[in-house]
Amino acid sequence: MIEAIRIGIGGPVGSGKTRLVETLVPRLSAAGLSVAVITNDLVTDEDAQRVRRSGVIDPERVLAVETGACPHTAIREDPSANLAAAERLNRRFGDLDVILIESGGDNLAATFTSDLVDYWIFVIDTAAGDDIPRKKGIGLLQADLLVVNKIDLAALVGADLDMMRRDCAIARPVKPTVFTDLKSGHGLIELTERLIDGAMLGVGVP
């Protein structure tokens, strides 16, 4: 059995991780990839239920992991529950190409272990403050792809997008950053291109 590529999606609470999952699934599917999703929450399956209700994926292809601890534990120190969920999906769907693993909302230090994922994305948003890239949390520094989401809110919260772009370039000189408004779809084409290329998914961008 060839295992699917596992892609992690992490970031603070409310940054847009679940929206990113809901946005990526149809684009990856349109590129001819067979996709499944694992969500992580502390004591509920709220995010999994949301993804199932979204209509972008067969509900059977969505599994929930209830971590019962700090979210980063299940994606870094002890990923066994997520690995078990990934194995279940691989066995259930023999054609599976990609599994998106969404972490529970965490802080700027959240990272994925390479035992769990092949590639990972870190999501922040402008409403949390334009100084976030300058603070250089380890998640922001180490992620394969950084997504700065909710650029539509920047003017409303006084966030300086030009400064954020400069600070991201300083913090991540050789790693890509994409600025998005996932609600409207702004930046989605570039994000998908970066993901498909970076994770070596071997398909064209739809």
From Swiss-Prot:
Disulfide bonds: none annotated. It is found in: Cytoplasm. It comes from the Bacteria. GO terms for cellular component: cytoplasm. GO terms for biological process: urea catabolic process. GTP binds at residues 11-18. InterPro entries: CobW/HypB/UreG_nucleotide-bd (IPR003495), P-loop_NTPase (IPR027417), UreG (IPR004400). Keywords: Chaperone, Cytoplasm, GTP-binding, Nickel insertion, Nucleotide-binding. One of its GO terms (molecular function) is GTP binding. HAMAP family: UreG (MF_01389). Homodimer. UreD, UreF and UreG form a complex that acts as a GTP-hydrolysis-dependent molecular chaperone, activating the urease apoprotein by helping to assemble the nickel containing metallocenter of UreC. The UreE protein probably delivers the nickel. Belongs to the SIMIBI class G3E GTPase family. UreG subfamily. Facilitates the functional incorporation of the urease nickel metallocenter. This process requires GTP hydrolysis, probably effectuated by UreG. This is Urease accessory protein UreG. It comes from Mycolicibacterium gilvum (strain PYR-GCK).
